[in-house]
């Protein structure tokens, strides 16, 4: 899996000061995407053991609330296995950190997807919050917290999986 960058002090992609892993590759090509450079899966750098160490070191600070995974698209079939391994490692090493994930798919679509090995459900099961839905330029709303358009939802992933229905983290 390739990634574009690791942002170490982000306040726009989840609650608190966060580390953001921007993965490469997205087949959705949403019009108006603010990360068009991340759509090509071959863009950026290979995520290696050194990248993992950098990520853990960045997260292991008392003022960092957690990790956000965005892109590109973390749930692309060619990213699922690696993203799962990364989230599993973060959960094990730093269990108090929250994990947010952005997906262009609706929650219901993501739960039905098949990626071969690791499924999107496996990845989502390690997340606290999932922001779902493709960016829609005609629904752009800069007043919304943590998302760009009104069709996107901020979902409490753990409670939604438990109740088998979407439970919003916030409106």
Report residues per predicted region.
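Conserved Radical SAM active-site core
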Residues: 2-3, 17, 35-120
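P-loop/Walker A phosphate-binding loop and immediately adjacent motor/lid segment at beta-alpha junctions
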Residues: 83-91, 140-171
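N-terminal [4Fe-4S]-dependent radical SAM core
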Residues: 1-22, 27, 35-42, 166-167, ...
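Short cysteine-rich clusters marking metal-coordination/redox-active sites
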Residues: 30
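Short glycine-rich, flexible loops that bind phosphorylated cofactors or substrates
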Residues: 76, 138-139
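Receiver (REC) domain switch/active-site residues of two-component response regulators
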Residues: 128
């Amino acid at each position: 899996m390739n990634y574009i960058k690791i942002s170490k002090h982000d306040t726009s992609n989840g609650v608190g000061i966060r580390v953001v892993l921007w993965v490469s590759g997205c087949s959705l090509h949403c019009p108006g995407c603010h990360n068009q450079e991340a759509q090509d899966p071959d863009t950026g750098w290979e995520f290696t053991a050194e990248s993992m160490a950098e990520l853990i070191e960045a997260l292991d600070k008392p003022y960092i609330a957690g990790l956000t995974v965005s892109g590109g698209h973390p749930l692309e079939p060619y990213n699922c296995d690696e993203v799962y391994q990364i989230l599993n490692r973060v959960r094990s090493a730093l269990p108090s950190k929250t994990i947010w994930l952005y997906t262009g798919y609706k929650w219901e679509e993501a739960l039905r997807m098949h990626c071969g090995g690791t499924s999107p459900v496996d990845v989502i099961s390690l997340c606290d919050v999932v922001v779902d839905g493709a960016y829609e330029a005609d629904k752009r709303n800069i007043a919304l917290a943590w998302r760009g358009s009104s069709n996107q939802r901020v979902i409490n992933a753990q409670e939604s999986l438990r109740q088998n229905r979407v439970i919003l983290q916030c409106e």
